[in-house]
């Protein structure tokens, strides 16, 4: 629950109100100018350039024509060095609060495969998989273990909206099911299931996304060592209930900002992530990544963290 003017309202009522307000603003804009979606293209001598995501989807469409190809989903990167302020040692039995290292490597692999797509289009049903690992690479005292690994298999449908409004291409809407787990058991187990809804839009220089989710409820654990039941009943209060992202490029530099929030006024929590990138080849980029907040990993979901790391990623956009 969240509280507004001392009145308790459900998260869904609040979210519905926000979406309704956005719809009213868009409707009013169209009502004032029924040709708003076509003004840019109709100006004499001006040719509308394709937006970032329009070009990205076209590249995906070309790649998916190859039956042996897979495509990038979320970011793919490796940070050989990162420093984190408050790492949780619980994820590996060899680690303790005394020997866990604040310096570690972090990497993420993320792919998607089409299960069904419309002819000559990227609209369709997809399977996605994202793996994120936190490796105590510099911790020779305990044989350099993996402190935590998170797995995210998901299935989602992507609709290509192809709507141009107020200078933006509203490129796609995605709806799907996401399972996130650290693959552990007992007191180390962390997992949750969500129904995810995302919208993606962009212009020539910028890309935006808005993502929200509904957590599928689970029964409470009778005992913390039970193999069934909710591993983390309060995860929404820390990890959040929605995420907003913005990316842009200037003078070859790329910037990606990601914000998560729990939408609770009384105990507001969330996170901010900022990634700076610079191309070192057409395929690879050097990156500097900064994170502050909750949900850096599942084992750390309720611990406030600050992390900074350097590494390399596959070009994102």
Go through the PLM ranges and name each one.
Residues 304-317:
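Outer-membrane beta-barrel "beta-signal"
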Residues 243-289, 294, 316:
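Long, repeat-rich segments with strong aromatic
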Residues 297-302:
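Short proline/glycine-enriched turn/loop segments at secondary-structure junctions
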Residues 1-61, 317:
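Cleavable N-terminal export/targeting peptides
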Residues 85-94, 101, 116-251, 259, ...:
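Outer-membrane pore/translocation modules
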Residues 33-141, 145, 149-153:
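Outer-membrane beta-barrel initiation region
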